[in-house]
Amino acid sequence: MKRIVLTAMTIAMALTATAQQYSFTFVPAGRTDTVLYIGRYYRDAVTLVDTAHAKGGRYVFKGRRDWPRGLYALVAQDGKKTVADFCIDGSRKFTISGDATLKAESVTVKGCKANSQMFTYIATENAAKREVDSLRALKKDEATREAAEAAEKRVIERMGAFEATACHPKNPNVFFDLQNACEPPEVPEEVEDKNTYYRMHYWDSLFAAPLGTLRPTLLHSPQLFSKMNYFFFGMLYYAASDTISAEVDRLMARIGDDTALARYVLDFIEPRYFRSTKNVGWDAVWCHIASEYYLKGRCPWALPGTITNMRYNYNRIKQSIIGAHGQELWMADTNQSADPNDWISSHRFPTPYVILWFWDPDCHHCQEQSEELKKLYDGMVARGEKRFEVYAVGYESDVAKWKRYVKEHKFNWVNVGGTNVNIDYQEAYNVHGAPTMIILDWHRDIIMNKVLPAKNIMSFLDEYEKKQGVVREY
């Protein structure tokens, strides 16, 4: 037992001996926090890793530790709000002073060239932005427009030269290394499809960087998270699911065997596509990510339980994504016949479209949406222009209540419900709440799996037919 204790003590002493002594002092004038923290970034989270208590307006973090080179956050006493970012790069003893928020223009740095350069860069950028903003009003006035545009051009050229010098690869500074690795692409003037070019070259700067040495720094930087988050949930927010899935594949192909970077990306985007209930097509993107990466064993970090749950959800969701063939339901109508020969099919209507409407008479939102859908349906029938049938499934265990509601509100479409049904429609169409809307086309393939306001249904069908090159004959 003594040998074990001595061995543990020896290891601890060795680790302490190899760790570097550090002293990081922050002097934010007028700040009243009793304590500040140092936080380390990872994706959209900041983990608190060190603490300093206020003494005479100074916050001194000191001790022995191996600090990885990178960008860190100085965090307020609430443990959430970032006061300012700073570098740990080379120097292990420095002082950063400034106003209460350490605004870049107010900051002075002693003992750390990297931090001095970073705050100077940010202050210069901020000043240039203020110059450009001040010229906006002048550009609107015809009398001053030409001079304002010329002045703006000079500011942009000046900043371009400044950035080229500051961010030059020969300038060893972790902040500039991160800026270069996450720099957006420049689109040549002669390129016609600028949006596509920008998207196709979006990740070039990252993979031009020396990932072997820079990877740990990148993974713990706000720059990489911002770049990734903007790409998937900014640029591609309204993109078709096929486009998003293709971009996931392109990025993962470039990442290759870099497990740390693959995990950084996939474990961030996967749950966000999974949880989305409003974005059309995101469930298909999630199914693609799940099937191509997690379920094929390409995510070695994923726990067995995670994979089991993902496989269950994948098998459940894939049946109702856009493009899947809708499963045919046979259900009893309000007569509630137990004879399957009397049941009504969800597919066998002469109309080119079928709207599967899963609703609950006790659901206020269902009531409102059903009334709007009824107005659209009745008006369409009255005009003799029946583009779709509504196959309304009563999502209610109290059959008598459901039948009474249908009768009182004069729902003249196809009303089905109860337990007389050929398959579990909740599993077939991923119905786990009401209302749920599924629109089937003439092949009875799913073309929409989100609830559309009734006023938007006709325009959606028009747009769908336009994309399919269909000429209406009804």
Where are the predicted features?
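Bacterial Sec-dependent N-terminal signal peptides
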Residues: 1-27, 474
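A non-transmembrane, solvent-exposed segment enriched in polar/low-complexity residues
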Residues: 20-173, 177-209
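Structured, charged N-terminal subsegments at the starts of enzyme catalytic cores
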Residues: 196-260, 266
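N-terminal targeting signals for export/organelle localization
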Residues: 242-325, 474
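N-terminal "domain-start" segment that seeds a small globular fold
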Residues: 301-346, 455, 459-469, 473
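Short active-site neighborhood of thiol/selenol oxidoreductases, capturing the structured segment around
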Residues: 342-373, 389-391
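Structural microenvironment flanking redox-active thiols in thiol-disulfide oxidoreductases
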Residues: 367-407, 421-427
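Thiol/disulfide oxidoreductase modules built on the thioredoxin-like
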Residues: 421-463
